[in-house]
């Protein structure tokens, strides 16, 4: 809603009064600019100079991957972030985790594209968070040891295969649900099955959205009894997060918490 949490500092390009031109930053992009501002401040205070300051360009591959994986709008600023990161990958300077993930996907980092991030690397990192523990993906991206990175990348690849099998089963369920509803005359579509996995509903929503060109939210039972956890995907012209914000204000008893951006 419009109520901001109590905090010493809130960094969000969408907060009222913020003149930062790019309003579609992913969280990793926000953090990258925070680090840049912090580096500038520390340099001005004499903590280091331009020759001894931390090299933030070493993070550009991670920023690019996070920007693509978060499916944010690729405005000019985000395109610059992605291009810089891809350039680092192509020059063989990516972190061991990204290099290992390129290897397990059979893709060539020397010719890396945003599609490699979106359809090769990101699904394997996300598979850990969807099915078990996101920490596996984080550890893979943070390790400096190529051997450890390779082992973790293999584990992520295995989890992704498991995720695909689960997604295929849930997609059959979703297709059956859609076939029995008059979706052509609906502004939005919501789907639910009691045995769906909450970590995969976003993928199901995305596929159905592409098929019927409607905003779709898919739900699964939450770990907390009595609640459902959903994930949505929207279409051009309908800002999903703003729509959920409107619903939460009209019916605060329906939505426990939510987040996201225009398209997801």
Where are the predicted features?
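Hydrophobic helix-and-loop "lid/oligomerization" segment in the mid-to-C-terminal part
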Residues: 40-263
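Short gly/pro/ser/thr-enriched loop/turn and capping motifs at secondary-structure boundaries
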Residues: 1-3, 9, 17-19, 223-227, ...
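Short, well-ordered coil/turn elements that cap or connect secondary structure elements
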Residues: 4-5, 211
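Short alpha-helices
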Residues: 5-47, 59-66, 260-261
């Amino acid at each position: 809603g419009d109520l901001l949490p109590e905090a010493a500092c809130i960094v969000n390009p969408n907060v009222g009064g913020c003149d930062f031109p790019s309003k579609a930053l992913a969280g990793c992009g926000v953090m990258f600019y925070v680090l840049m501002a912090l580096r500038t401040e520390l340099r001005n205070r004499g903590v280091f100079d331009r020759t001894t300051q931390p090299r933030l360009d070493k993070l550009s591959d991670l920023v690019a991957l996070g920007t693509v994986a978060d499916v944010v709008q690729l405005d000019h600023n985000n395109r610059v972030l992605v291009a810089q990161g891809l350039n680092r990958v192509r020059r063989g300077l990516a972190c061991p985790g990204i290099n290992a993930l390129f290897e397990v996907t059979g893709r060539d980092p020397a010719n890396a594209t945003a599609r490699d991030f979106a359809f090769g690397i990101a699904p394997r990192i996300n598979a850990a968070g969807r099915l078990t523990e996101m920490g596996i993906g984080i550890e893979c991206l943070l390790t400096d040891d190529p051997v450890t990175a390779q082992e973790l990348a293999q584990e992520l690849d295995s989890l992704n295969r498991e995720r695909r099998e689960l997604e295929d089963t849930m997609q059959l369920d979703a297709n059956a649900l859609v076939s029995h509803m008059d979706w052509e005359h609906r502004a939005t579509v919501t789907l639910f099955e009691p045995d769906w996995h909450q970590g995969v509903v976003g993928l199901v929503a995305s596929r159905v959205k592409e098929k019927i060109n409607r905003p779709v939210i898919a739900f699964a039972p939450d770990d907390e009894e009595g609640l459902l956890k959903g994930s949505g995907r929207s279409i051009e012209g309908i800002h999903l997060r703003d729509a959920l914000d409107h619903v939460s204000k009209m019916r605060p008893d329906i939505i426990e918490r939510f987040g996201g951006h225009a398209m997801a």
